[in-house]
Amino acid sequence: MDHHVSTIKPRRIQNQNVIHRLERRRISSGKAGTHWHQVRVFHQNVFPNFTVVNVEKPPCFLRKFSPDGRYFIAFSSDQTSLEIYEYQGCQAAEDLLQGYEGEILSNGNDQRSVNIRGRLFERFFVLLHITNVAANGEHLNRECSLFTDDCRCVIVGSAAYLPDEPHPPFFEVYRNSESVTPNPRSPLEDYSLHIIDLHTGRLCDTRTFKCDKVVLSHNQGLYLYKNILAILSVQQQTIHVFQVTPEGTFIDVRTIGRFCYEDDLLTVSAVFPEVQRDSQTGMANPFRDPFINSLKHRLLVYLWRRAEQDGSAMAKRRFFQYFDQLRQLRMWKMQLLDENHLFIKYTSEDVVTLRVTDPSQASFFVVYNMVTTEVIAVFENTSDELLELFENFCDLFRNATLHSEVQFPCSASSNNFARQIQRRFKDTIINAKYGGHTEAVRRLLGQLPISAQSYSGSPYLDLSLFSYDDKWVSVMERPKTCGDHPIRFYARDSGLLKFEIQAGLLGRPINHTVRRLVAFTFHPFEPFAISVQRTNAEYVVNFHMRHCCT
C-alpha cells in the first residue's frame, strides 16, 4: 500500500468567474428543464455588495415592492395616504458612488457622504402618486398590503378606534349567535379596505366593516388568491368573500358564517316566519337565534359522521363528551387554498380575543368548500397527517407561484436546505426540556394558516444559491432581531463569502437592554435591498445595492 497517496481528495470549487459562466452557457445547453436554474446561478456573481448607512428618506413608512419589481409603495407619516414610487433600477445611483471603494458608506459627516445619503432615495425611487385613502379618523395599517396578480392594483386596510361614548348598540356588537365578547386587548374598530390603481394612483373602490374586528397586521385577516379576496371578521365570526375585477372594484360573492348559501334566509323564513318579518322591519336579532350557525353546523355534522364511520361506541361518546367545547370554538385565522377552498383555524374564544396567549391551547384546522358548502377535512393541531401534508406541499399553502410562471420558492417541500433547517428545528423541540414529538408538531403547525404574500421571492434569499443565518434574515417578511455583526452570505456551491449586509448604524455604542428590530425588503429579482432598523422610536434606513468598485 502506498502511504504517500492521499486518501482524502480536496473538494474542487467550480469556476466562479462570470465570463467563464457566460461562455459555458453559450456553448452548453445543459440538461433538459434546467435552463432557469442555470440562469439563476448568475445571481452569485451579481449581488448587493455595497451598503449606504442611514439613508435620508421622505417622511413616510416604507412598505414593499410590487411582485413585478416596477413599483414601491409607502405610507405617509400620518398614515392616511398611500405613496406610489417607480423603481429606477439597481444602477440608478452608480454615478453618485463613483470612486468609492470598499463595501460600506458609513454615517460620515463629510460633504460628499451627506450629499449621497440625501440624494440616494430620489435616485432609486421617483414619486408617481400620493393617494389620500383613509378618512373619518382612520389610519392605514403599515403592515397590510396585497397586490393583484397583474400588479395593477394594491389593496390596503385602515382602521379607526371606536369611542367609548356613545357605546355601540348591543346588536351592532353581537350580530349573530357566534359573535365574540370584545375586551381591552381586542377592542372593536371601524375598518375599511381600499383598492388603488398603481398606474394612475386612483382610489378605485372601498369596503367598510363597522364595529368589527379584522386583523390587518401582516395580512392575517384577509387573503387574496388570484381574483378572490376573503376577509375574516373575528368579532362577527363571518368570512366575507369578494371578487376583485381587473378595473379594481370589489364584487360581493358570498358571506359565510350564519348562513352558507345566499338564499338560506328564505329557507329559514319558511320554517320561522318571524325571522322574515323581523328582517323586513329591521327588528331582527340574530344573536338570539336558537339554532347553530350554518358553518359551525357543517363542522359538527362532519365530526359526527366521522364518529359514525369509526363504528365504535367510544368515538360517539367522545363526540358527545366534547360537544359543548366544539360548539364554543371560534374562527381565529383563515386562508384560501384555491378559488373554492378555505383553510380555517378554530380555537377557544379566549385565544381569539387575546385573553389567553398560551400556544398550547387546543385548536382545529378545517378545510371548507365554499361552492358545495361542505367540510372536507378536520385536523387537530397535533395531527401528524396534516404535518406531513404541510411538509410535502408547503408551496400550496404559501401559494408561492401565483405571480410568475417561473419561481423558486424556498420552502421545505421544494428546497433541501430549507428542509434541513426545518428538521433541525423539529429535532431541537423534540429533544428540549418539556418538548417531545407532540409539542414539535404543535409548534410547526402553529405556522398555519399562512398569511398571503408574506414570503420574499428574492434569489438572494434562495437557500439553494446562498447560505446565511436565518436567525437574522429569512424569506418570511417579518422583523428580525438586529445582530451586532454583518449578515454574511456564502455561495452554496463553493462555500465562498460573496457579500455582507450591514443593518443599523455603525460605530454607535450598542445598548443590549433595548430590543433592536430590523425589517428587510428585497427587490423580487434585482440586487437591491432595504433594511429598516427600529430602536424605540428611531428608524435607520440602509440601502444595499450593486456597486462596481473600479
Curated annotation (Swiss-Prot):
This is DET1 homolog. One of its GO terms (molecular function) is protein-containing complex binding. Component of the E3 ubiquitin ligase DCX DET1-COP1 complex, which is required for ubiquitination and subsequent degradation of target proteins. The complex is involved in JUN ubiquitination and degradation. The keyword Disulfide bond does not apply. Belongs to the DET1 family. Keywords: Nucleus, Ubl conjugation pathway. GO terms for cellular component: Cul4-RING E3 ubiquitin ligase complex; Cul4A-RING E3 ubiquitin ligase complex; cullin-RING ubiquitin ligase complex; nucleus. Its main location: nucleus. The keyword Nucleus applies. The lineage of its organism: Eukaryota, Metazoa, Chordata, Craniata, Vertebrata. GO terms for biological process: positive regulation of proteasomal ubiquitin-dependent protein catabolic process; protein ubiquitination; protein-containing complex assembly. It is found in: Nucleus. Component of the DCX DET1-COP1 ubiquitin ligase complex at least composed of RBX1, DET1, DDB1, CUL4A and COP1. Highly expressed in the ovary, some lymphoid organs and resting leukocytes. It comes from the Eukaryota. Pfam families: Det1.
